[in-house]
């Protein structure tokens, strides 16, 4: 609840769909400390899709009397992401519990694409930026998943790394299962 209730890190975004702002989609980020959440809600029956990148303007006091200026922040600023080549953003979708990975640089430069069915919501939690390993594990996993989610990032990575080893056991497993089945 604390991730949703504060105002210090709250940013509201427009969803850009086919060159226009989709007024039916509510998109915002918020957080506390280093923790961030990203929320989407489609308030219409029709499917919505598009990109978010820049927050809507918000008022900031300048400290010069009653003077106020309008500011915006990027999604990457709202999520504490940097555009370094070896940085990746991992996050978990609340409803499905699936984990996702994206290049932080892509989010910084392009924003984030979202697709929502009518009256659907998505809440991304556990958002964090990680640095790739020397053996490029996050890069390999990001390219392999290609935008799809998985139940567990570490398990998906292990399955990817050891897929050739697993393939060598398939004939033995089939043979063992057949032997068990034949003995019944």
Model-derived regions, located:
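Carbohydrate-interacting/catalytic domains
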Residues: 1-184
């Amino acid at each position: 609840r604390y991730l949703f209730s504060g105002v210090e890190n709250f940013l509201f975004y427009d969803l850009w769909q086919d060159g226009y702002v989709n007024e039916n989609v509510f998109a915002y980020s918020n957080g506390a400390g280093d923790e961030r959440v990203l929320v989407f809600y489609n308030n219409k029956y029709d499917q919505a899709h598009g990109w978010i990148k820049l927050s809507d303007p918000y008022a900031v006091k300048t400290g010069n009397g009653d003077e106020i200026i309008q500011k915006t922040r990027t999604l990457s600023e709202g999520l504490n992401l940097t555009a370094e080549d070896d940085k990746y953003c991992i996050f978990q979708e609340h409803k499905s519990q699936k984990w996702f990975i994206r290049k932080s640089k892509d989010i910084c430069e392009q924003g984030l694409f979202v697709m929502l069915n009518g009256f659907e919501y998505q809440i991304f939690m556990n958002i964090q930026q990680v640095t790739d390993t020397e053996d490029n594990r996050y890069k390999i996993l990001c390219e392999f998943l290609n935008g799809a989610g998985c139940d567990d990032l570490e398990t998906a990575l292990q399955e990817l790394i050891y897929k050739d080893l697993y393939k060598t056991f398939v004939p033995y497993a089939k043979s063992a299962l057949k032997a068990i089945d034949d003995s019944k």
